[in-house]
């Protein structure tokens, strides 16, 4: 199976092409939310480098949020267009689950995505399983959310966020995301 995966839901753009379990080509870069200026040229370059044309993709996948509304629209529009043109299915993935999937934690993974006005999108995951549905929390509520997760699970909660509030236990996201590997779980 061949598939194209993109993530435009955050500052970092990710594009990957995979054949079965083999990553043929991938690209990840902080594009400062300028995905529309970079996405198509990066897809074109990766298709050429991989030797796997879009017409040979078995499906197209992208992150459907939460995250940057405009970024999500760019990603969804791109994969839906490819899906219609090549008559192939389109898959979407929750951005929070994907961030948690890619990090091994000795407890509960709590990915955060910055929202507006000091708020965060967050969820809680243990070994790829959702413990708490994605939600938006105020910055002041975050510590309460983490303590609640720890109390319910009996395990420490680790925040996955670049930077993040001080004084909380956290893991840095991988420097090079392995988002494409989560496709096996879909």
Named regions from a protein language model:
Residues 46-50, 85, 103:
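Stable alpha-helical structural segments in soluble proteins, enriched in small hydrophobic residues
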Residues 38, 73-74, 171-172:
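Generic recognition of short, well-ordered alpha-helical segments
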Residues 38-41, 77, 81, 98:
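Short amphipathic alpha-helical face segments that pack within enzyme cores
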Residues 59-90:
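DPxDG-like acidic metal-binding loop motif
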Residues 1-64:
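N-terminal beta-alpha supersecondary unit
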Residues 14, 70, 168-169:
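Glycine/Thr-rich phosphate-binding loops of Rossmann-like dinucleotide-binding domains
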Residues 22, 89-186:
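Surface "functional belts" at beta-alpha junctions
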């Amino acid at each position: 199976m061949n598939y194209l995966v993109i993530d435009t839901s955050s500052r970092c753009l990710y594009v990957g092409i995979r054949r079965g379990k083999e990553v043929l080509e991938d690209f990840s870069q902080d594009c400062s939310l300028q995905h529309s200026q970079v996405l198509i040229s990066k897809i074109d370059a990766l298709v050429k480098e991989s030797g796997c044309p879009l017409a040979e993709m078995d499906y197209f996948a992208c992150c459907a949020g939460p995250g940057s509304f405009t970024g999500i629209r760019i990603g969804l529009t791109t994969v839906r267009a490819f899906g219609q043109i090549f008559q192939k299915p389109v898959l979407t993935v929750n951005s929070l689950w994907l961030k948690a999937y890619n990090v091994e934690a000795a407890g509960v993974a709590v990915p955060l995505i910055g929202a507006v006005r000091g708020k965060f999108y967050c969820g809680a995951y243990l070994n790829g399983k959702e413990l708490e549905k994605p939600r938006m929390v105020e910055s002041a509520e975050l510590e309460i959310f983490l303590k609640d997760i720890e109390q319910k699970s009996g395990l420490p909660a680790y925040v996955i966020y670049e930077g993040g509030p001080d004084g909380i236990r956290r893991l840095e996201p991988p420097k090079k995301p392995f988002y494409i590997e989560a496709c096996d779980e879909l």
